[in-house]
Amino acid sequence: MDFELTDEQRLLQDTVRRFVDERILPNAVENDINHHLDLDAIQGMAELGILGIVIPEEYGGAGLDFVCEALACEEIERGEAAFRTLISVHVGLNSLALLKYGSEEQKQRWLVPQASGEKLACFGLTEPAAGSDVAAMKTTARREDDSYVLNGSKNWISYANVADHALVFAKTDPSAEHKGISAFVVERGMPGFTTLDTEHKLGIWAGSTGELFFENVEVPAENMIGEEGQGFEIAMYGLDQGRFTVAAGGVGVIRACLERSVEYARERETFGQPIGKYQFVQDMISEMVLGYETSKLLVMQAAWMKDQGLRNTRETSLAKWHATESAFRAAHLAIQVHGAYGYSAEYGIERYFRNARAPIIYEGTTQIHKMMQAEHALGFRNLNGRGGDVSPLCSWAPALASVNRPKASLSSGR
């Protein structure tokens, strides 16, 4: 079993680490306090190839593997969650879905400029009454000649007000539940398509979150991705890709909290000795170490499976669930280690705490992932498909039980 990184992977890791240290972290606290989205940093990410990191070179991407993507997301979220969120939405939810389901013409039209960062994309799935229950969406797409007319709205959409276009999911057959959902690329500037900022969020202040509104928006039929009724499948595929980057970003949060806490615990003294000498502080540090190591192992297991072309819904779900919960716990502990300084916005620790809360909700809540894992273990379904792939390291694929299982829809929160 080889845990070594290749020279290419180490080079990518070092390059992104320097970028975060030089371009993101110096302004991270100020941008967060001022609710400022640093577009120059996004341009820098594009120049490094991060916005097309796993997209093949033939479509303008960097053509790197998923281990590289995980390493990049870890480093980026060590600096700022808003920029890892962009990778999740732009690359994971959108570009990889286009790569799998888009026609060659659609790939040239949208994927190529997305991979270079020339254009940014967002993912329009979540609605006010349709989060985990995707099939409950109200947005509709009615066929009229060579177009579809979209009506409805989406909320909690990352980069809604910045993206050049959105991958939007709407019901072409409202009576068919999830089988009646289709996917469309809706471009900014189309008449009737508007966006609005979402304000007063708990965290990710340095990012962009908003709403999408569709009022009789005529979308050419050629903008449909895949086939009519294939939207749910496309959304679930995109979520597998997005969840992977969320998990990898969670690893970055834990590492940031651990590094800052270790540094502080070695320097801060009380009663004549560093606070790191006290067992209660050591307990918190050790818990962060465990969270980091276990989360990274789960992420790398999923990355390996993705690079082998194996279905990894189960493994990615585990990684997302564990890493996001561990990240929030690590941020809580880091504040405790730092005491009053951890509570101060200017010190930058509480930012990780606020930002780490959202990933526990989007890309499937913790409760959704627990349900998925339990149903898999009980044999009610195989998350990687009937007779699907399993990790050779920690396989768990019981025979499917011949019982009726409850219907379950999986959430994006995007």
Label the predicted regions.
Residues 117-125:
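A short, Trp-centered hydrophobic/proline-enriched beta-strand micro-motif
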